[in-house]
Amino acid sequence: MHLEAVSTRANVTALKNPNWNQNLFLMLLFGLTATRAWAAVPSANSVKLVTQHGYLPDLPVLVRVEVLTPQGTRDWSLWDGEAVLSVDSGAVTLSTNRIPMRNGMGSTLVSFSGGGDLNLTATVGALHATRPLASLAGSPITTVGGTSAVDAIWSGVVRVTNDFTIPAAFTLTIQPNTLVLLDGVNSGTAGVDINVNGRIDVQGTESDPVTFTCSSTNSNVRWGQLRHSSASLATAPVSTYRWAAITRAGRAPGEGHTGQAPVVRSSAARVRFEHCSITDHGVTTPGAAGFGTPGKIGYATGSDLSFDDCLFQRARMGPEVDGTALLFTNGVIMDMRGPDDGDGMYIHAQSAGQTCALKLSVIAAGDDDGLDTLDPVVTVEDCILRDWASVVEDAKAISVFNGVTTVRRCLIVDSTVGISAKTSGSNTTVRVNIHESTITRNRTNVLAQFKSNATGPRIDYRITNSILWGVADSVASDFGETNFTIGFCNISEPWPGTGNIVSDPMFVSAANHDFRLLAFSPSIDSGNPQSTADADGSPIDQGWITFLPGPSALSHPQQMPDGSHRFDLSGYTNRQYVIEYSTNALDWLYLFTSFQTNDPSLMVDPEARNSPMRLYRARLAP
């Protein structure tokens, strides 16, 4: 007779409880104990609430809410949600108490009337987070403007009454918990600007962020822009914005795509944004006065930009970059609205030696293209692109116009067209590489599109290890099938190519936007066998997310006459499992790795001889 135990973190803890002494004794007595596969008992998700530490009555404040997994990443499985705001002061009234959320992220502008210190709480389902906000009414205000002839340091409440310029070789430092109020106008292009010809260092923190916003409580009044420029990119200093909210700008001259004003204008400059929110620079309600004006997120020429953990929301369009290196990681772009060109991002050709990449990000909900391109070489990895569904604007999640775009491990859904590619003439080409991605629930998943003077053979799609599912015409061309080379894909229509299948991919719940694969989906292990294997040693799957089987189980323990131990491992086939052992249920050591070819498989531990107690557990590699 042998005792079986489940080795979870909770039960290992229980073994140290005095009430379990008898069971521990039985383990010692009987020796071999088989265990199920273990997994750390996860903590619950959590809510992160980011907003400025102090506020002025009736002046809108950006409130950003995120739902985080126990690993600290945004919970993308929270496809659509809502955060509810509340305060603990009966003397304070909120302009709104609801924040729509997508994939674990949402924000809105909230004004607090009545005054007084308060605690602001954001609740998402059963989760909540609270932050104190102190009233800044009556606080001293520093007034600035003009050109600074020295390094400048801002703190507290700062009001910029006319254009402020920091010259070359000088630095503007903005300390944590600074509220920067810029004077604005209700029409035209004469809002107050900050011109950075030298360097800016915004030193916000999560608990004490920096805010740039308009000094007026009138929502139609907006300031101008943040303008970065230098003599050359090679000698440009690096400007940094950390934990900054930049809201209610755009009264500046229009430039580039859409002709609207860029809130961040960069020319031959190096600018880094970390944990920033650039929001509320345009009218995004259809039919409202000024719809689609006056601001877009940014416009850069000849520059080097990076954005990490940044939110762009509620503007005419996201950033437009030309001849510029761009890295956008762990970010969210939402709600780019307006008549024509309400794009999430627009990337032109970069300069020699520069790269453009978007990674680990969500690009959701706009009136035109999630990502629009003109001639660049760009990589999109580990992203969700969703809800670019306007029929009027011929919307696409990704629009590729010349150049090379590579899409890897992405989910592209609920758009008019998933990916469209076109060229401008007989002397231009376009290449689209799609690997390990899921493109589904779009009117058309991939399209080779006609453009004036274009010829079909110059559009070249290479698609592997992907799922293109959900519409009768999943792969469409204005020219012919020769635009597409497709292999080892699951497509909702027959298509020539090695390894292609037409079979329901068995999503967990497409209706609820859960596009993971169910066990025994035909897309599991069905990718190109020459591709790099998945981390657990199995052949690569088709689609954007690797299938993870359920817990394995160890059973039927036996102690053989020679003292060795045997037991069965039951787990998903074609996967590597790591077996570990312990003599005290607390300290675990590696024993061996086994490739599961049959279910169950016999495991043998020849080193177990003369062990007073031996516990085992198994997990999926690596």
Region spans (language model):
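Surface-exposed loop/turn motifs in large extracellular/passenger domains
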Residues: 167-173, 197-209, 228-243, 263-275, ...
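Residue-level detector of buried hydrophobic side-chain packing
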Residues: 174, 212, 244, 489, ...
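Core sequence-specific DNA-binding domains of diverse transcription factors
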Residues: 40-138
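Predominantly extracellular beta-rich ligand-binding scaffolds that present long acidic/polar faces
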Residues: 141, 382-387, 397-514
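Short glycine/acidic-rich loop motifs that flank beta-strands on beta-rich extracellular proteins
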Residues: 161-165, 183-191, 215-217, 221-224, ...
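C-terminal accessory segments
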Residues: 498-546
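Short, composition-biased motifs enriched in small/polar/acidic residues
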Residues: 549-622
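Extracellular beta-helix/beta-solenoid repeat scaffolds
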Residues: 155-224
